[in-house]
């Protein structure tokens, strides 16, 4: 492609190739490079001398002030230092100009022997020149030189004489007046310069000259030659001359009336020096106004130590033919300066450094310096410039940005030698760019968009000599600023003072850490802070904290060679510089597409009506129209229809400018296979109307109390750029995870002190009372004594903020929860996220279509079992009947009355388990052949409803099914262990019977389950009506505030109402309670009262209580013993107690059984109604056996009397007085009724559904707590349900996020670093990039690590997963018992090798060990062999038992707490 192709004016030269640039340097440029470096060294030496003189003068003034007892405050002192810096820079420039004028040859100018003397001579004349400048400045302020008339361009030539012959030529100095006495430059280097039209540079009769540019406080009228030349109306001035004649103040001054096309200066990039140096982003040194001001292209810029001087984004390219330039807004260019290059320029302020500089120059000699200048402009972007640039232009560019190579170490060690004014603005600006979430062109900073790209690159860059623009320099400065604690470092001290001083005016810097385990709550703003916040200000962030990488989802940049936009190469006549274009489209191109006038203002200006800036544009416009509070609710201005990409044409152009070549292929939506797409957000399945409905719901805050909801709605009405673009709220914190004291089981309250320690895989907590009561400085945790000194003292005040996600298109930020973003699918650059606003735009412009619902598997995609099918069919049938009845009573048709829709019932887990009988209880009944274990099947049943197009989990219950293989007393029994729900069911009206529709649905699910169990052959169901304590959760984590926790009597009545319905449908035969059925002999019951008849369930109340009683009974002393629990005391059951109950033979276990039943009955009796026993089959009134076969003998006179065949035979052999009914003379006859339809053996038609986190409720609750899957609001319930379904469809995916070992922040998928030796040692990219990791082993990138789990596409779990799992468990058992060296069992040899690896592995956390541990846990969960030979099986089962004991202890403690509250309430009412 021809790079010299003519294009219209104001175009930008770009490169069409992504290959490395080829730069050809001419000998003339080599000579100029050598001259540049020597002149740079001389300037530094001049600056050092001037600075030394100024310090001596300042010492004199300080002594004078001390004698006069004058005190100078800090602000005045800082202003004085800044003023001195400006004076030194101005004096250095003047001295160099005088040296140029007085030198007659090249050798004389660079003669170091007489250099110091010449400088001191010139310094003696400095007083007069400064007086002239003060006079000129005073005249300017008085309005004497404020009017600049627009004149046409004139040709000004530079006449020089007195040539010298040294083999090199010096490029002429561009001045507005001819220089006299200067040494000659070759005639071939003389050139004519022309200035363009000067109109629009400064308006005629402008009131104040210093309003042209932000930050001009006092004009400094001086040319490059040092002469004092006042600005007159008939002298054409260029931008270079204007800024050379202008003195910049230290802090920017606000515009009084900023012109719309000249207010592009940025406070962070504002110069403090009165000239343009090599920081000019335009290679030719061209600096122009937004109109058409041009300047000579071969001027020698002043290479000031301040790298950010002269940064003017309103410049445009130079046009050599001087044609009139179009009056269009100028392109926005990226910041460029040597500060961000690999090499820094430093101005030494110590004269001891001058010999080193001189030695470097002398060693340089006449060596060639090829390619030096290209690094100073746009590294890697100049291509074939020998063919593109005229000779004069090349020579001018060669002098445009001289550089002095200084090692990076010197920058860190001697930060005072660099420009403090530059860093004073650059570091705060980097902090702003790191956290700014404003959309493109909406941030007050015009360069924010480019700076954000720099920050994103820096966050992940580890290349020592990175050539990415501004990367290395910024990294060095940030590392130094983070580590520097010296109060003598002027730069760092000034930056911190500047940030503290401007903390209310800097654009808000907000931390956004997702799923952070150690994040703190945002401090409350003061009244001043809140007032500044309303005006668009910000809170002051912690500098050290902000240096931490934010774990909002960062979209990491590819290497520089991969970010070349796909665009045509365009060149500009006259300039000819070929540059790699920005990923950001320049302002000129955008204006051409949109015809939109963009007005940028300095960031420190209070923009009027800032709250009316349309932040989310079209999307929020549509949402706000439907918001009850009015059209302006949410702080958005109702403007014309706009969006993140304002026009379809712009969208197309943006894609062409920013998309890499390999991504610039537009594919049709119709041909994309949804199953192969990486979908990160559920919003991609919505239609635009559904998206708007979702956002409206977010801002209603369903689930919160009325007070909190109104507060959040009010915050949404004052939405700022830092707020989430969906919910309109900025700072949201998760509910803290509840923690419990391991010794006593009591929940540790918020903000309470406690002690913590990690033991094995578990973390234990100890409350302050238990810690203080621990004897011998030891605490017993999990059967292990731990010294108290090892426990860490903590406060239960940890808060975790919600995470953020950034749109890849408009770069707006939203909460992960609001966006329904799946962070588990976030694989960095490969995962694309489109915000709802851009999504609506694309759908409405037909650029994409909503994905099919099958693209993201939901609840309906879960496996259908016979149980779930039975429950769904029954539920839908009952709902239809209820709806028909309601329509009949209301006189409407079936379709006219609302009903519950989109309901899905699924069995999410069905696992075989074994319940081991506790040791002491088993020992008590060993002689009676009591079973040592009870096999059962644990099932988890969940109800989902699609609410606002998201399937939300509303109801869940865990059940235990003991079949015919369990044996008595658990044979054919079902235990409803846990049940939970959240109050989001739709609709919310009541049924015909008066109950809520959600209650009706939940009751029907329970009745349907009992009906299913009865048909399978189960005889009874047991329910413990025990509500959780306030703040605790059973299944679903964090309930909404609008849902009250029911008291025990309310919950019991809820169950009994359900059972009454079931009785009417003949599902339930009889209801009683555990105490009346087993602890007392009522009526004609002839069964023994023994604990051996009690059904033994996992997690039930009485098994653990009985074990505690037996432990007390085994104690030998007669006195009292204090339990190590809260100072409570209980009496020991002694021999005297056994004699008191009539048990004379103390050695018999029956005596202990009888005494234990008595004590246990005393405990249960006050709450006996809570232990509900449901009979699904008829119960024999004599032996209390539930009859399943044969006949039941019924009495026609007595309604509820029936006995089994066995008891009937015994009844016939009794004497007449003992027959039914007892104590009555007239005896009743019994008639047989055949028992039918009860299966002889209980078999489950459904296959097992293994699940690591759904096999019991504690594992599921741990999953929700560890990932903050909360349900206290509908917005969080949607996201939590989405993630739960993700885990169900991806059983092999990691369940918990990886946490950084250093900062305790979440490490994203495929990000960060991992140690292959140390288990659990992971480091995020931010901590890794700080080079402060003291780890002895090599860290491996997690993106390339072999232990990264590959998630199945679209969450579709393999159908053979369960089958493979069963085969692996069988293989594990075989390999553990096999002793043959020639075993032919498939996989046996590999399994043995796997065992040997785990034994020899020193890491214990390698991928192989992790896989084996997962398999061992699955085996131990269901293992029934007490002498199992599988490695670690017994240990894993012991750990599981201890965890279950802790859970049981907490539940019993909660029951006792409720009993005490109930007793206290009864005392108060009585």
From Swiss-Prot:
Residues 11-20 have a biased composition (Low complexity). It comes from Arabidopsis thaliana (Mouse-ear cress). Its main location: nucleus. The keyword Nucleus applies. It comes from the Eukaryota. A zinc finger (PHD-type) spans 764-841. Residues 1-10, 342-365 have a biased composition (Polar residues). It holds the Pfam family zf-TAZ. Zn(2+) 1 binds at residues 1180, 1183, 1204, 1207. Residues 856-1293 form the CBP/p300-type HAT domain. It catalyses: L-lysyl-[protein] + acetyl-CoA = N(6)-acetyl-L-lysyl-[protein] + CoA + H(+). Its EC number is 2.3.1.48. This is Histone acetyltransferase HAC4. It is an enzyme of class 2 (transferase). Acetyltransferase enzyme. Acetylates histones, giving a specific tag for transcriptional activation. Keywords: Activator, Acyltransferase, Chromatin regulator, Metal-binding, Nucleus, Repeat, Transcription, Transcription regulation, Transferase, Zinc, Zinc-finger. Acetyl-CoA binds at residues 979-981, 998-999, 1054.
